[in-house]
Amino acid sequence: MITKMPVRLLSLSLLDLRDKSVMWDVGFCTGSVSVEAKLQFPRLEVVAFEKREAGKLLMETNSRRFGCPGITAVIGDFVEMPLENYPVPEAVFIGGHGGRLKEMVRKIALLLPAGGTLVFNSVSEDSRVSFEEAVAGNGLVLEQTVRLAADRHNPIDILKAVKR
């Protein structure tokens, strides 16, 4: 699923990338958030994780199409994979979680430095509550929630957590 432009731009704004050097995009799907981040911040190192094999080709195609090479696409189950070979993120966007949101947040919270940001777009009450619970239980503070209705249907809650 492609993250719609208003949602993507607000998510990137909440990630506060201007003084950061490494961003992770977990569950990147088509890579729209990674590509937009790289376009806005060309020096930003972007590491994008996706479970589905087809994601790699989508990321390559989209990064080439929009002229932003240098995004590292990693294919595999984020929760299960070792992450020590990747640069430590200062900002993380969760685009997809495959029903394992709490496990993802736990793993990310262990890696984020103090002041690091985590942004999640919730399309359901259940996923919003799950994110809030995961944040509270893993040393993160929910700093901001923005409800965005890009159209008349399907409002999206964009949640920002920060590691203290």
Where are these regions (language model features)?
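A short glycine-rich, Lys/Arg-flanked "PGG" loop and its adjoining helix->strand segment in the class I
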Residues: 103-117
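Glycine-centered, small-residue-biased loops immediately flanking beta-strands
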Residues: 21, 44, 116
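Active-site capping/gating segments
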Residues: 125-164
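Short beta-strand element of Class I
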Residues: 43-49
